Amino acid sequence: MEIKPATLEDVDQIINLGKSVSEFQVSDRVVTFWPKKVLIDCIKSKQNPIFVAVEDSQIIGFIIANYNPSFKKTIIENIFVDPDFRGREIGKSLLDSLLNRLKELDCEYVCSLMEIKDESAVQFYLKNGFNRGINCVWMDRILEDSFKK
């Protein structure tokens, strides 16, 4: 298994994995995963690190982050490992690769959002040195049709 920065050739596999689960859904009006153009723009950008876990030429996991250099802050947007490959520390390897890249970018703060009831995600982040924050309500407004369901 190899962890590497995502390339444009990885986009379709990332989208297929991302659309295969409901964990990324934030409301019933918004697409459940990133539009293809958004992912392509992220991969081309230096501000949006995306790493993939690859085994036998197949992407089996990914992590997507959004770094804001003005605030020196990163939001981990998504982390996913194919259920058939969980329990092998792949999520930790993806997170470690991301954190190393963020240090290179001079990032000073990293956060992520997840459903309160997603205890496995909460435990994953706690185990990897994150602190549990306060409970929040997700609010959104669609400005472009590409995000409509």
Model-predicted segments: where are they?
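Conserved N-terminal entry element of GNAT/NAT acetyltransferase domains
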Residues: M1-E9, D145-K149
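Acetyl-CoA-dependent GNAT
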Residues: P5-V11, I15-E77, L95, R101, ...
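Hydrophobic adenine-recognition pocket in adenosine-nucleotide-binding enzymes
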Residues: A6, I79-V81, M114
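Conserved acetyl-CoA-binding loop-helix of GNAT-fold acetyltransferases
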Residues: V81, G87-N100, K127
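Conserved active-site alpha-helix within GNAT-family acetyltransferase domains
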Residues: K92, E104, I116-I134
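Conserved GNAT acetyl-CoA-binding A-motif
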Residues: L102-M114
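Conserved beta-strand-loop-alpha-helix junction that forms the acyl-donor binding cleft
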Residues: S112-A121, D140-E144
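Terminal substrate-recognition subdomain of acyl/acetyltransferases
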Residues: K127-N131, V137-K149
